Regions:
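Catalytic cores of phosphodiester-bond hydrolases, prominently lipid phosphodiesterases
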Residues: 1-182
């Protein structure tokens, strides 16, 4: 409701007219929860990015469903007011960025580097390869369960990872503000 009120008052959410990404992390039953979510999203359709008949229209808020994702229910919705948070294995399949605009995965399942000292070159190369795959497919990339480390944040930033996840928001904010403009 607060986002919708801001949208109604200003005609947008963010000042630069970019789309805000709203990640909805489903922890309970995927199908039952999505059924409720889908009904709620329709009420805010004016501000939500939408895919209809395979045509995407970006609006003020783009909803991405994460966690327990009801893949077929989301994919078959038309119009569709939510997208799917993909996994790294989705990069090796022909899954469109219209349905999978974001790829998220558990850092610890794919990398041994824990943010202390220098990242091994083989892992740095692997990270850059994954980033390249995502960008080539028009998808954004993020990892969860990352170490809370400026050394790792620097590696993610240098590699071009789109979103850096953290539980230490102030610390990451201050660190990002200290970085040179890119």
């Amino acid at each position: 409701q607060p986002l919708f009120q801001r949208f109604q008052d200003n005609g947008c959410i963010l000042a630069d007219d970019c789309s805000l990404t709203l990640l909805v992390d489903i922890k309970s039953s995927a199908e039952a929860t999505y059924a409720v979510l889908a009904r709620q999203l329709v009420q805010y359709a004016d501000m939500l990015s939408v895919t209809k008949d395979d045509q995407f229209q970006q609006r003020s808020v783009t909803v991405i469903v994460s966690g327990n994702r009801p893949l077929e229910s989301i994919a078959s919705s038309n119009p569709r007011y939510a997208c799917v948070d993909g996994r790294l294995e989705d990069l090796n399949q022909s899954k469109t960025s219209l349905l999978y605009p974001l790829i998220s995965d558990n850092w610890r399942l794919h990398f041994r580097y824990r943010g202390q000292g220098e990242m091994p070159q083989a892992e740095r190369d692997k990270l850059r390869e994954v980033v390249g795959q995502a960008k080539t497919q028009g998808k954004r990339l993020r990892f969860w369960a990352t170490p809370e480390s400026p050394d790792l944040w620097q590696e993610l930033l240098d590699a071009g990872v789109d979103l850096i996840g953290t539980d230490q928001l102030t610390r990451l904010h201050d660190w990002l503000r200290s970085q040179p403009k890119r």
